[in-house]
Amino acid sequence: MPWIQLKLNTTGANAEDLSDALMEAGSVSITFQDTHDTPVFEPLPGETRLWGDTDVIGLFDAETDMKAVVAQLEQHPLLGAGFAHKIEQLEDKDWEREWMDNFHPMRFGERLWICPSWRDVPDENAVNVMLDPGLAFGTGTHPTTAMCLQWLDGLDLQGKTVIDFGCGSGILAIAALKLGAAKAIGIDIDPQAIQASRDNAQRNGVSERLELYLPQDQPEAMKADVVVANILAGPLRELAPLISVLPVTGGLLGLSGILASQAESVCEAYAPLFTLDPVVEKEEWCRITGRKN
């Protein structure tokens, strides 16, 4: 169905108040957007970190009387009569279909392809992971996921056990299994991610070799030959004591979700127990790998 969009500009400090005002005026959803396209990285849990100059965008049903909406908003103390705004009619689109049409098979390293479950594989003889991301992250399109997939593709995983810490869609754990790992363990704090991983594992015929846990349910003294964690720099630093004990002696560690500017602090957290390789960078992100001492 078609929609009407109302956009207004404000400061980050006032964005939440104006979001509430738009919802009270009948908006069905709110989007915060940086006026100047400045990225915001790594908000704290539960935090909505906003920009100094923020566009607040309300989405309204096409039948909404926008003159009445504007009149109501003019009564808000942060806006007033004649406040600056922009109203647009949005064309009707099948957004899910548009997203699916833009998700194409991607190659990582020498052997590995990530393929949308609704498309044909480009190479039947390759290692093909059929993926439906569902509600969890992890399609291979982000540089951090891509670097982790390339790293796994370059390893000899035959008969190995792999832990995917923060498994999301299960893409890394499933890729490891398809690349020869005997067993993979996925851990995530989000039950939706656990379900997406389970569904994708079944789609790829590896569900019997994949164990999935919420953190509170994971077995004690869990160990693996290879541990990969594609989360964020803050949690990687904070969880270093927990993650560092997961690889066996001589086991391998791969970390990503890290901005290049954060690499040094993450390396410092893991250097006491690992011999670290040179940091690999892709765009503004990086990957840290090493071997357990």
Swiss-Prot record:
Lineage: Bacteria, Pseudomonadati, Pseudomonadota, Gammaproteobacteria, Enterobacterales
GO cellular component: cytosol
This protein's name: Ribosomal protein L11 methyltransferase
Subcellular location field: Cytoplasm
Keyword 4Fe-4S: no
CDD domains assigned: AdoMet_MTases
Principal cellular location given in the protein's record: cytoplasm
InterPro entries referenced in this protein's UniProt entry, alphabetically: Ribosomal_L11_MeTrfase_PrmA, Ribosomal_PrmA_MeTrfase, SAM-dependent_MTases_sf
An example Gene Ontology molecular-function term: protein-lysine N-methyltransferase activity
Residues noted as binding S-adenosyl-L-methionine in the record, renumbered to the chain: 145, 166, 188, 230
EC class: transferase
Function description: Methylates ribosomal protein L11.
